[in-house]
């Protein structure tokens, strides 16, 4: 009998087992036509879990409920699974972080979110306490992640899977960028995890909440209406001439979308799309054609060049994780594609790998909306390029060209944002 998971779409508690299955090579099928509130109320379902909780895993040995137990079962289905670490102490630390994730992160997120969604009574004082407790928990997690890429060891474990799935509810539903910016290492960790192929296959593209949900107010109960006494009809008056009816107010026309401040800058002689086409279409003599063309086009009054250096290179001990981290950064920069061009280099033949970049932005400074919206910006040191300095100018050319070796070291990867 195959493993069958009963759940609804988008259930972060089901994600735990499904991601563990992807890492473990264990086949888990989803129950067909599952409908929350219907399927989990049937006699057959209630035999597996008398209180009808979701998810449930059907196994050859009987049903398993509670999401962490299900994820553990799936992980244990593969012998010597690295998701459980390689030593007794690693196993203990994995269990430690799974418990922390449930009691500190998930529980406090729920105490903040569920009353706002109408699933529990909303009490302002209780909400303040829940937020304070969640910040305390995220602060502890942030401290741990300041010097660790993963929760335990040097690769993904079940602790990372459970923690990321529990963080997902907060990031996706209630924890806005303004809230999570206090915890930059938690942000980096979360976005790195959800962009791993096995996570992404299950979770899809993850977006952060734009706002905190409004408190759901219950509609007031309708007042009982007393039966009205029959009124005696008054003699009808002669009909008066109708006054001109007041026309209903016209719907307000939708306001035009405010222009991006960068669109209001004085015109530049540099046409960014022309440079991007030149970059993409130059296959030979890159230095003579593309690099020379770039400097011929470059307008220091309309654009600015910036070097960036990752602040936490000591954490870059795994090549694919480092490259995925850079890939996630470029995905989140998509909001400024119209106004920017970038090159990101992963440097070194052995860990820890260095991450450096070059960015061309419209305007004399890094756009404010990029600094506000893309959390990765805080993870880099940014230095404005002085093109009057020939050494800096040559460094720009080398980064655009992916020149190897770069500053005496091999290039592990080079990514272009265009």
Curated annotation (Swiss-Prot):
UniProt signal peptide: none
Superkingdom classification of source: Eukaryota
SUPFAM superfamilies tied to this protein: eEF1-gamma domain, GST C-terminal domain-like, Thioredoxin-like
Biased composition, class Basic and acidic residues, residue ranges: 221-246
Pfam family, one: EF1G
Boundaries of every GST N-terminal domain copy: 1-82
An annotated Gene Ontology molecular function: glutathione transferase activity
CDD domains on file: GST_C_EF1Bgamma_like, GST_N_EF1Bgamma
All residue ranges annotated as the EF-1-gamma C-terminal domain in the record: 258-418
Keyword tags: Elongation factor, Protein biosynthesis
Quaternary state and interactors: EF-1 is composed of four subunits: alpha, beta, delta, and gamma.
Function, in words: Probably plays a role in anchoring the complex to other cellular components.
Protein name: Elongation factor 1-gamma 1
């Amino acid at each position: 009998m195959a493993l069958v998971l009963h759940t609804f779409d988008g259930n972060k508690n089901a994600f735990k087992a499904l991601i563990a299955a992807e890492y473990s090579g264990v086949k888990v099928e989803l129950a067909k036509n599952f409908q929350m509130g219907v399927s989990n109320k049937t006699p057959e379902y209630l035999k597996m879990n008398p209180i009808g909780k979701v998810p449930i895993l059907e196994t050859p040995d009987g049903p398993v409920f509670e999401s962490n137990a299900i994820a553990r079962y799936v992980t244990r289905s593969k012998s010597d699974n690295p998701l459980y670490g390689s030593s007794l102490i690693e196993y203990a630390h994995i269990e430690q972080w799974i418990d922390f994730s449930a009691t500190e992160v998930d529980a406090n997120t729920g105490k903040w979110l569920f009353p706002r969604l109408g699933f529990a009574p909303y009490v302002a004082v209780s909400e303040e306490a829940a937020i304070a407790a969640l910040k305390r928990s995220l602060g502890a997690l942030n401290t741990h992640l300041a010097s660790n890429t993963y929760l335990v060891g040097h690769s993904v474990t079940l602790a990372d899977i459970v923690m990321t799935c529990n963080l997902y509810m907060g990031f996706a539903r209630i924890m806005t960028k303004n809230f999570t910016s206090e915890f930059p290492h938690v942000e980096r960790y979360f976005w790195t995890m959800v962009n791993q192929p096995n996570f992404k296959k299950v979770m899809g593209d993850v977006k952060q909440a734009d706002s905190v949900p409004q408190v759901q107010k219950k509609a007031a109960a309708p007042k009982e209406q007393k039966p009205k006494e029959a009124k005696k009809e008054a003699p009808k008056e002669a009909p008066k001439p109708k006054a001109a009816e007041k026309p209903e107010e016209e719907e307000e026309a939708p306001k035009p979308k405010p222009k991006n401040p960068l669109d209001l800058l004085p015109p530049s002689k540099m046409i960014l799309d022309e440079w991007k086409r030149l970059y993409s279409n130059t296959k030979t003599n890159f230095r003579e054609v593309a690099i020379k063309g770039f400097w011929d086009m470059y307008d220091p009054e309309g654009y600015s060049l910036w070097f960036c250096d990752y602040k936490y290179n000591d954490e870059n001990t795994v090549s694919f994780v480092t490259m995925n981290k850079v890939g996630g950064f470029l995905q989140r920069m998509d909001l400024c594609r119209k106004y920017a061009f970038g090159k990101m280099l992963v440097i070194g033949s052995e860990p820890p790998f260095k991450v450096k970049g070059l960015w061309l932005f419209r305007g004399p400074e890094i756009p404010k909306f990029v600094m506000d919206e893309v959390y990765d910006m805080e993870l880099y040191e940014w230095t404005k390029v002085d093109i009057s300095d020939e050494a800096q100018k040559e460094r720009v050319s080398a980064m655009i060209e992916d020149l190897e070796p770069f500053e005496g070291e091999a290039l592990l990867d080079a990514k272009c944002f265009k």
